[in-house]
Amino acid sequence: MIETDRIISANTVQTKDENSIDRAIRPKTLAEYEGQPAVREQMEIFIQAAKSRKDALDHTLIFGPPGLGKTTLSNIIANEMEVELKQTSGPVLEKAGDLAALLTNLEENDVLFIDEIHRLSPVIEEILYPAMEDYQLDIMIGEGPAARSIKIDLPPFTLVGATTRAGLLTSPLRDRFGIIQRLEFYSVDDLAKIVYRSAKLLDLDITDDGANEIAKRSRGTPRIANRLLRRVRDYAQVKASGVISYDIADKALTMLKVDPVGFDHMDHKYLLTLMEKFGGGPVGLDTMAAALSEEKGTIEDVIEPYLIQQGYLMRTARGRIATLLAYNHFKLKIPDSLSSDQQQNLSL
């Protein structure tokens, strides 16, 4: 995962203080969990059924873009099941012994949460298969001719895997999850509720319009909404009476160069370069990287996804093309030099 310092990126590296605040305002139960109605309804049923049978919840895979609450949902699952949660990540599990130590310390029905599960090594995956299916740990002791396999029985447990790249999971691993949940981007209404709830937990005064304005610029992502709330709080404390109103939220976010649709300076630079320097495209990735002085990976993984999701950019076989939405957003005239085919693409 490429990390960045953009305030509107869900991959932004957070400080210890920010992480501790995030943990404090996370919902602890499904009743407190805003948004994702289908996921919430399904998980309520699955958890109640497992508890009534006194069984471990089926292994659960949660995937979706960063910042939508995969870790939060895993904690909620453990809280609702009234069990302990052990947490790790795919890159950390380098040796068989690392995973074996975690598995042998689980109590009955505990939750083992593995973030970035798509980054597990093949060796670790092979150990997970019998653990997930049969609750058995199958490990090799010794080396060479003296090596032998031993089986250790494990208590029933729930593996919760989280990933932003579900397509990178191997089929054998993916097929062993009984529950698969995709988290979608949040609506403005749901994000406004999250902002309002977070503000109250942080003992902040906020109006409905103020919460709504922060939500509109948060790119459908709770992590970004909570980060923007903290920055608007700072502005309100220094420049106003501390109350976060629409006017204060608008001024603070404008100062931070986050526009009404959630674009920041990098989004503006990308789209304006594409439209003003290259006539809207099509433009190849190498050319855009050189024009922006950015790494190709940063462009593909950090800048472009949101622009594509929101319909401001198309990635075609011939290159990147700015859409009609992009021209309208910046109030730019569509060049007459564009071919009829490109004009048709722009109007889609």
From Swiss-Prot:
Residues 187-257 are annotated as: Small ATPAse domain (RuvB-S). The gene is ruvB. Keywords: ATP-binding, Cytoplasm, DNA damage, DNA recombination, DNA repair, DNA-binding, Hydrolase, Nucleotide-binding. DNA binds at R315, R320. One of its GO terms (biological process) is DNA recombination. It comes from Francisella philomiragia subsp. philomiragia (strain ATCC 25017 / CCUG 19701 / FSC 153 / O#319-036). Residues 260-348 are annotated as: Head domain (RuvB-H). Signal peptide: none annotated. It is found in: Cytoplasm. GO terms for cellular component: cytoplasm; Holliday junction resolvase complex. GO terms for molecular function: ATP binding; ATP hydrolysis activity; four-way junction DNA binding; four-way junction helicase activity. Mg(2+) binds at T71. The keyword Lyase does not apply. The RuvA-RuvB-RuvC complex processes Holliday junction (HJ) DNA during genetic recombination and DNA repair, while the RuvA-RuvB complex plays an important role in the rescue of blocked DNA replication forks via replication fork reversal (RFR). RuvA specifically binds to HJ cruciform DNA, conferring on it an open structure. The RuvB hexamer acts as an ATP-dependent pump, pulling dsDNA into and through the RuvAB complex. RuvB forms 2 homohexamers on either side of HJ DNA bound by 1 or 2 RuvA tetramers; 4 subunits per hexamer contact DNA at a time. The keyword ATP-binding applies. InterPro entries: AAA+_ATPase, AAA_lid_4, DNA_helicase_Holl-junc_RuvB, P-loop_NTPase, RuvB-like_N, RuvB_C, WH-like_DNA-bd_sf, WH_DNA-bd_sf. PANTHER family: HOLLIDAY JUNCTION BRANCH MIGRATION COMPLEX SUBUNIT RUVB, PTHR42848. It catalyses: ATP + H2O = ADP + phosphate + H(+). This is Holliday junction branch migration complex subunit RuvB.
